[in-house]
A protein has these predicted regions:
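Surface-exposed loop/edge segments in extracytoplasmic proteins
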Residues: 69-76, 203-204, 476-477, 551-557, ...
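Positively charged n-region of N-terminal signal peptides that target proteins for export
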Residues: 1-4, 599
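C-terminal outer-membrane/trafficking sorting elements
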Residues: 15-18, 198-199, 508-515, 519-599
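Blade-terminus and WD-like Trp-Asp/Gly-His loop motifs, strongest in beta-propeller folds
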Residues: 79-82, 217-219, 263, 516
């Protein structure tokens, strides 16, 4: 049997060489022929051309999936995307390392009844992404380094729900502002929250979260969505702020925080940062480096992947414009936004390539590239173009908007920009921009939203002030800021009718890091209790203190509490300087954190 398959593969190799285009019967195949860095959980996605009888793909023997040692894989067959996409899922995951052969036999037929020419292709299983924490720490260290120069070092830590202060207002557009605070700054620390505010800075909704969260937004279907960093996925809430769904990447990929777009057909778009150990990136660069690629996925209403774009297949690592490729960690794309274009294709923003890329959503091929090393456009009225941008969006007039962080402008400055694109003659004409006076510079994050009345909401990202709203003539009508050193990833403005007397309740049990830390001699310890069941309206809370050896010092708290956020003071006046631990037990939940007493 093995000899038979070897003969079949040999004959197929000859067939492929002789065939002018063995893939001409298919608009899209994923994994791509010859692709590498494929996950063990990968599915095979096939989009046949319209003249293929898609039902013949499900016949026994029409498609075979073979491993490198000629072991045939059994698989399930599913049709998605209105009958246009076939998804094959092997009964058992692939095993790395291996070469996988996908063989299309002459049992696959066209709508006229004729058979296709048999062919096969292969791709390479190289295991799943390496530990994402390596890159998480690396990425955050870059942001923090940029942020330190912007933070007022005298700013105190902000606990609980941060205040949003209006610094200027002159008839802003109606609506509510949706945002979140970034919390993992070295100084000051602050409590992660999901926030909705009115034009006067009053919070109409706030929810303290146990860990960092991002991208609070309203989707076209009316759901409120946000990314929960502790869970590594997006969650959706209804208008009562109740979690009703979750969204995450498929095919073994982790879910990135930068973007979730829910489409009108129930599909959704996400991205994943794919961390790989690369033996050789070419040229004189070091061997054996850790590289972050990007995966763009479209998933259907059943959360099956129906489309996938992988940077490994289309971008070069050397496409990065300002990354130091001599380092051991390389983030060459750093994609941060996805937009469904008016023609149904995709636009993605890749910050570290200084590039907006248009991708054919049917074939997965690149249509054009704007900015960066592979720029195909001529910039008009904007000779320097954009630098390390965020927030690609196609607006109603057909133009695109961006938040230009401007990291490599000289000197650096940030702005909101609008281009009119001629996609035939490849020109990008700057038709509008807003640049604050004096300049505001945000080294990372940020967003631009064109509002219904043609005003523009600008979230300044990793700096203060937090956001502003401007008219098309450049007149500022609103400016708001979080406390100094507290930033927001994005901000949006939408019509929204808040619930009357809505309670601000935590979503989960949590023990929050004490503040200040280090401390002398008093510090505050906070904890949260989510909504409780009807059977139990209170929860017993026990907090104990231990020294660095684990010896019990004292019981700080033993009492019953209802749902909410609480704090308790710990006084270390009678203790020596050193490391201590505080531990909480609330029902089945327990946690321990470290604190440092310095005298």
């Amino acid at each position: 049997m093995k000899l038979f398959y070897c003969i079949v593969l040999l004959s197929l190799q000859i067939s492929v060489v002789l065939a002018q285009n063995p893939y001409h019967n298919f608009d899209y195949l994923d994994p791509l022929p010859g692709s590498k860095y494929i996950n063990e959980e990968a599915t095979i996605i096939i989009r046949p051309k319209p003249d293929i009888n898609i039902s013949t793909l499900s016949q026994t023997g029409a498609i075979k999936i073979l491993t490198n040692n000629i072991i045939e894989n059994s698989f399930s067959y599913k049709i998605s995307d209105g009958g246009r996409v076939v998804i094959l899922k092997t009964t058992n995951n692939f095993r790395a390392p291996d070469s996988i052969y996908v063989y299309f036999t002459n049992l696959v037929k066209k709508t006229d009844g004729t058979s296709i020419e048999p062919f096969f292709y292969k791709f390479y299983i190289t295991g799943n992404s390496i530990n994402k924490d390596i890159f998480s720490d690396y990425y955050r260290s870059i942001i923090y380094e940029d942020a330190r120069s912007l933070i007022n070092q005298s700013a105190s830590s902000v606990s609980g729900i941060p205040a949003l202060t209006v610094t200027y207002s002159n008839n802003p557009s109606p609506g509510k502002i949706f945002f979140n605070n970034l919390t993992r700054m070295p100084d000051p620390g602050n409590t992660p929250c999901l926030l909705i505010a009115d034009n006067d800075g009053n919070l109409v909704f706030a929810r303290e979260m146990p860990e960092e969260c991002f991208d609070l937004n309203i989707q076209p279907n009316g759901m409120l969505t946000y990314y929960d960093d502790s869970k590594g996925k997006y969650y959706a809430m209804n208008s009562n702020y109740e979690v009703i769904d979750s969204f995450y990447c498929g095919n073994g990929y982790s879910t990135d925080l930068h973007e979730l777009r829910i489409l009108d057909n129930g599909h959704f778009l996400l991205m994943s940062y794919d961390n790989r150990a690369i033996a050789n990136i070419g040229g004189e660069f070091p061997m054996n480096v850790n590289v972050i690629g990007i995966i763009i996925q479209e998933l259907d209403e059943n959360k099956d992947v129906v489309f996938q774009f992988r940077s490994w297949d289309h971008f070069l690592i050397t496409d990065a414009t300002h990354e130091n490729l001599a380092l051991s960690n390389i983030d060459y794309c750093h994609s941060n936004a996805i937009e469904l274009d008016n023609d149904g294709n995709l636009l993605i923003s890749s910050r570290n390539m200084d590039e907006i890329t248009k991708i054919d959503r049917k074939t997965g091929r690149i249509i054009w590239r704007l900015g960066g090393e592979n720029n195909q456009f001529t910039f008009i009225n904007d000779p320097d173009g954009f630098s390390h941008q965020h927030a690609i969006r196609r607006i109603k007039n057909g133009n695109i908007t961006l938040f230009d962080n401007g990291n490599f402008h000289n000197p650096p400055y940030s702005r909101a920009i609008e281009y009119k694109l001629d996609e035939v003659n490849k020109t990008a004409t700057l038709v509008w921009q807003y640049r604050n006076d004096p300049d505001i510079y945000a080294p990372a994050t940020g967003f631009v939203q064109r509002l219904e009345n043609n005003n523009t909401l600008i979230c300044w990202g990793l700096t203060n002030p937090t956001l502003c709203e401007v008219r098309y003539d450049g007149t500022k009508v609103l400016e708001m800021t979080l406390p100094q050193g507290v930033f927001s990833y994005r901000a949006f403005k939408y019509p929204w009718k808040e619930l009357p007397n809505s309670e601000i309740l935590p979503s989960a049990y949590s023990l929050i890091q004490n503040y200040p830390n280090p401390f002398n001699p008093v510090t505050t310890i906070k904890f949260t209790i989510p909504a409780l069941t009807a059977e139990s309206t209170v929860q017993n809370v026990i907090i104990d203190i231990f020294d660095v050896k684990g010896s019990f010092i004292k019981n700080l708290l033993n009492d019953n509490y209802s749902s909410g956020t609480y704090s308790v003071k710990f006084d270390g006046n009678n203790l020596a300087s050193g490391i201590y631990f505080y531990s909480v037990k609330m029902g089945n939940f327990s946690d321990t954190k470290k604190m440092i007493l310095v005298k």
